[in-house]
């Protein structure tokens, strides 16, 4: 066979292979969670939010064809509103606008809804200030994206869709383009992994959320840069990292710490709804087991005496969160952990035994879909305007599903499955 024919055949086969997903090849946009970070944070060590020392984004870009996969960076400890604003302008281009009414009501520390210098250039040929380039300036209804998010990123992308389509619930936000609404069709799908749609009981169980979050950020930094002393992501002077006054103040409703609690999530869900024009998908996971007298896969050194009514962390759960996942917080003076925490105070979200199973950070019950919003088990036929639940991954903790620290290749099949579904929509 002549070489030109061989090449033509090879190209034809490659084209068929690339199009094996069928319907679309829209960009996938990855959105990190609470205490998350972008690709530049640990560039020296090579540690990535998506994949640890492996690379989920890089894998997706070349798996079964060529695809555009965009990795975003938003505030590590910001509210979903603020993170949505950063996400919008980072993708589309322009300077971040948090909204005038929102900024005033949230008492943003700098008093500005358009902080200087927090910009992305949509046109590389017209960039006199040398701003970083926007990720996808063509973004609109004719050029939609697939949003894929982990943990608090799930709340962030839901907020973004709400603002895109319906605008700000406050009305005019000082002219910010994001808050005008009317952008239906810009998002083809939204997929969440281990997202606290109804909050996480970890927020209430640990008491001092700020102290624990700061400690967790330091542990993440140590894991990401072995032998070094890097600045933890939540403490780095990143854009939007501390938009509101008193970020750990329990009365600060414009903060991640509030929205991630069950009560804050309920308030968030009261205005952020499921769009009838978007495909929603969710994945749950857990890394705890019911207590037993002996012989289960839990960490018996951490919890030698167990009660079958409660959940305990598996031996292989990440050390980062294992002390908070079981019946008791270790160490503590009789404070229940996620595997044993309940509360039934009047006027608050009831947290009962159904919340005990968890992945070390988020309760499995909370990962399926926001309470009261449409949800169904995915049966191979996706439905718009409803959460299509893709199932629960047993034995995976909050960081396993990201491939941390060196489990990226074990996590790849999860993302391959998601991509296969999205590209067929």
What are the functions of these language-model segments?
Residues 21-148, 152-211, 382-425:
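N-terminal non-catalytic accessory region
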Residues 1-7:
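Bacterial N-terminal signal peptides that target proteins for export
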Residues 17-19:
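N-terminal signal peptide c-region/cleavage motif recognized by signal peptidases
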Residues 7-14:
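Sec-dependent N-terminal signal peptides
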Residues 162-425:
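Helical cap/lid subdomain of alpha/beta-hydrolase-fold lipid enzymes
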């Amino acid at each position: 066979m002549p070489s030109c024919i061989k090449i033509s055949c090879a190209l034809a086969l490659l084209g068929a292979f690339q199009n094996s997903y069928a319907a679309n090849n829209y960009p996938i946009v990855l959105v990190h969670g609470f205490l998350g970070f972008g690709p530049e944070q640990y560039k020296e060590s090579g540690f990535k939010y998506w994949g640890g020392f492996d690379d989920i984004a890089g894998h997706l870009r070349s798996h079964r064809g060529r695809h555009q996969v965009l990795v975003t960076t938003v505030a590590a400890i910001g509210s979903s509103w603020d993170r949505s604003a950063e996400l919008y302008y980072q993708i589309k281009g322009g300077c971040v606008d948090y909204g005038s009414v929102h900024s005033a009501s949230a008492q943003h520390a700098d008093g500005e809804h358009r902080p200087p210098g927090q910009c992305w250039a949509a046109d590389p040929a017209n960039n006199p200030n040398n701003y970083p380039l926007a990720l996808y300036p063509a973004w609109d209804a004719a050029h939609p994206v697939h949003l894929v998010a982990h943990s608090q990123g799930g709340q962030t992308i839901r907020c973004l869709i709400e603002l895109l389509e319906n605008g700000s619930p406050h009305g005019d936000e000082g002219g910010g383009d994001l808050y005008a609404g009317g952008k239906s069709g810009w998002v083809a799908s939204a997929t969440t992994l281990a997202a606290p749609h109804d909050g996480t009981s970890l927020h209430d169980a640990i008491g001092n959320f700020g102290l624990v979050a700061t400690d967790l950020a330091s542990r993440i930094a140590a894991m990401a840069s072995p032998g070094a002393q890097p600045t933890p992501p939540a403490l780095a002077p990143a854009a939007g990292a501390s938009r509101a006054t008193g970020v750990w103040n329990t009365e600060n409703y414009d903060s991640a710490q509030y929205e991630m609690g069950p009560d804050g999530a309920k308030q968030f869900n009261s205005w952020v709804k499921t769009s009838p024009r978007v495909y929603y998908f969710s994945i749950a996971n857990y890394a705890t087991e019911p207590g037993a007298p002996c012989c289960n896969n839990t960490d018996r050194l951490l919890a030698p005496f167990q009660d079958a009514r409660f959940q305990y962390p598996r031996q292989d759960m990440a050390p980062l969160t294992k002390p908070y996942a079981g019946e008791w917080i270790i160490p503590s003076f009789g404070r229940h952990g996620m595997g044993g925490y309940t509360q039934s105070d009047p006027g608050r979200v009831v947290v009962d035994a159904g919340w005990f199973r968890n992945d070390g950070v988020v309760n499995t019950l909370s990962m399926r879909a926001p309470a009261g919003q449409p949800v169904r088990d995915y049966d191979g036929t996706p439905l718009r305007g409803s959460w299509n639940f893709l199932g629960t991954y047993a034995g995976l903790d909050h960081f396993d599903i990201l491939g941390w620290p060196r489990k990226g290749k074990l996590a790849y099949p999860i993302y391959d499955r998601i991509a296969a579904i999205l590209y067929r929509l």
